[in-house]
């Protein structure tokens, strides 16, 4: 795998989501290619805290390209709605889930009982706080925690989606607006692989 080049596996059906998935995965591939080319095998691999920056950067690049190429009102609305949905799902929803995870683990640390009702109550409170949505009117949604595998197999993983997304938009904005050194900083961040602490690597990107 190291120095052999990444592979993208994608069932492309010609839908808009497929195009964005392709751009997303290409971001990971570019990241891997640059890291492998500039780092020894011991520090080429990067963490999730950095990984989703390149992928979402590419999604934003594709979005801007498509918006610049179409004047059709309905197509533009679909593209903008897709971007809004992505923002909600990647930033706000994942932040809510991270908050939920913290509160659930805190119960265990404090020796308090952890039951289905307690866990669902936390989710209901957070949906009301984050979205103003009363889950009493949406039965079963309070159990969303039960089918999110990250909570059970990869604790404290989901917050990184939100941090990467925020970092990616900041870096993309600087590159798009031709801030001096922004593109080089971004590429150097990708080339860094896992050669430093994740936060320090992200700082290199801007």
Describe each PLM feature range.
Residues 22, 30, 68, 94-101, ...:
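C-terminal, non-catalytic "cap/extension" segments appended to globular domains
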Residues 19-30, 49-50, 54, 61, ...:
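Internal glycine-rich alpha/beta core junctions
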Residues 35, 45-74, 83-85, 89, ...:
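Post-HExxH zinc-binding segment in Zn-dependent metallohydrolases
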Residues 39-46, 74, 110-113, 180-183:
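Short, surface-exposed loop/turn segments at secondary-structure junctions
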Residues 13, 17, 42-49, 87, ...:
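Short, solvent-exposed segments of well-ordered alpha helices
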Residues 27-41:
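Catalytic Zn2+-binding segment of zinc metalloproteases
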Residues 3-23:
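Short pre-active-site segment immediately N-terminal to the catalytic Zn-binding motif
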Residues 1-9, 80-96:
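Active-site-proximal, well-structured secondary-structure segments within enzyme catalytic domains
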């Amino acid at each position: 795998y190291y120095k052999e080049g990444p592979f993208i596996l994608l069932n492309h059906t010609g839908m808009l989501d497929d195009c964005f998935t392709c751009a997303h995965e290409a971001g990971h591939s570019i990241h891997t290619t640059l890291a492998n080319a500039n780092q020894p095998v011991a520090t080429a691999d990067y963490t999730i805290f950095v990984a989703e920056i390149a992928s979402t950067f590419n999604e934003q690049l594709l979005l801007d390209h498509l918006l610049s190429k179409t004047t059709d009102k309905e197509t533009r609305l679909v593209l903008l709605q897709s971007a809004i949905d992505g923002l909600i799902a990647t930033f706000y929803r994942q932040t809510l889930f991270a908050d939920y995870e913290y509160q659930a683990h805190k119960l265990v640390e404090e020796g308090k009982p952890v039951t289905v009702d307690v866990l669902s109550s936390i989710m209901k409170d957070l949906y009301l706080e984050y979205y103003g949505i009363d889950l009493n009117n949406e039965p079963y949604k309070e159990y969303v925690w039960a089918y999110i595998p990250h909570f059970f197999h990869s604790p404290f993983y989901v917050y990184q989606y939100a941090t990467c997304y925020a970092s990616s938009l900041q870096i993309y904005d600087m590159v798009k607006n031709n801030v001096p050194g922004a593109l080089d900083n971004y590429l150097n961040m990708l080339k860094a692989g896992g050669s430093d602490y994740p936060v320090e690597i992200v700082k290199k990107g801007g």
